[in-house]
Each structure stands twice: as structure tokens, then as C-alpha cells.
Amino acid sequence: DHYDHLDHSTIKRIKDNVNIFVVPHGVGNHLRKWEVKEENIIELNWNESFEKDNIEFTCLPARHFSGRGPLNRNSTLWCSWAIKSPFVKIYFSGDSGYGKHFKKIGDEHGPFNISLLDCGQYNKAWKYSHMLPSEAVLAAKDLGTEFFMPIHWGGFTLAMHPWDEPVEESIKFADKVGLSYLT
């Protein structure tokens, strides 16, 4: 539920035009405060799924934390997502440090056609919350992805690295291991 992933003004603007908000457990409390109708909120815990119109959303583990301030740290669930249709499998990492969970997710839910992986806003001291570009590429390999898309870079300045370093480094590492990517 960090501000760079859950924006109050955006939700207020779109809430009447979105039929369903599929969110991790606890995030529904924010949505209800922002006047999203209860029947439009689906909250999931890790390894729970919701299917609508032949599209399945599965809430999966990530290595991160939640909170919109110091008083509500870890009061909602952080997660990643597998999104599957009869035609494509997509993985979205959300914010996550690198870990064994990527291999497990790949084994249980993959392989994926496209994996959108956190590669920005990193610092070696934050390795349990955000991946380095090289780790994002390792995660893509663990997931068994066909195409890797580096995400979570270039939107907000939260780390000291140069603006476009995350995507440039990710592409460099992807090329080294023969991984196809989308930018």
C-alpha cells in the first residue's frame, strides 16, 4: 500500500469506472475509506486466486513490507501477482527483494510469457526489499519467463543511482544470459 503503488487521487478518479479491484489483504480498508463500493473489492492472501471472464489473478509472495507511514507498518499484505488467461501468463513482481520464492513461483505457476520485475530504486543495503538489476534478471530466469520487462524505475527518485541505470543495467545482464526483454 505504499504511495508509489496506491495513489488516493487516482483511485478516486477511476473508482466509478472500475468493476473490480483485486488487491492484497488489508488494502481494501484504504479503498473503502476512498468510497470504493464493497462489492467491487476482492482481497486475497498469498496463494489465493480470483477468476473473472477466464482471467485468473493469483496473489503470490514477495519479499518486501507495507505501510503508508510509521504507524501502520506491515498492516497490509505485500505481494506479487500471476495473471493467467487461456492465451498468456504474466507475472508482476511488485516491489520485492530477490529470493527463493521466484523459483518456487516459476515451478508452481510458470513458465510465464512476460515477467514484469522490479529493477529500480535499489541500494545494496535494501537487498531484502528491492532487487538489483542483475537480481531481476536472475528472478526472470527462475520464473521461466520468455520476455523480461524491467519495471519500477524512472517514476520516483527513491535511491541514489542514476535515473536510467536500472533499465540499462538490466538489459546488459539480460543480454549476458540470453534473456529476451521488452522496454
Tell me what each language-model feature is.
Residues 31-45:
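Helix-loop-beta element that forms the nucleotide-linked donor phosphate-binding surface
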Residues 20-22, 26-29, 89, 97-183:
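Cap/insert and terminal regions of metallo-dependent hydrolase folds
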Residues 4-5, 66, 124, 157:
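Short glycine-rich, flexible loops that bind phosphorylated cofactors or substrates
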Residues 44-110:
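Core dinuclear metal-dependent hydrolase active-site scaffold
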Residues 2-5, 64, 92, 130, ...:
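Histidine-centered active-site/metal-ligand motif
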Residues 16, 36-39, 55, 76, ...:
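Structured loop/turn residues at beta-strand edges in well-structured enzyme cores
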Residues 1-17, 25:
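Di-metal (Zn2+ and/or Mg2+/Mn2+) metal-binding site signature of metallo-dependent hydrolases
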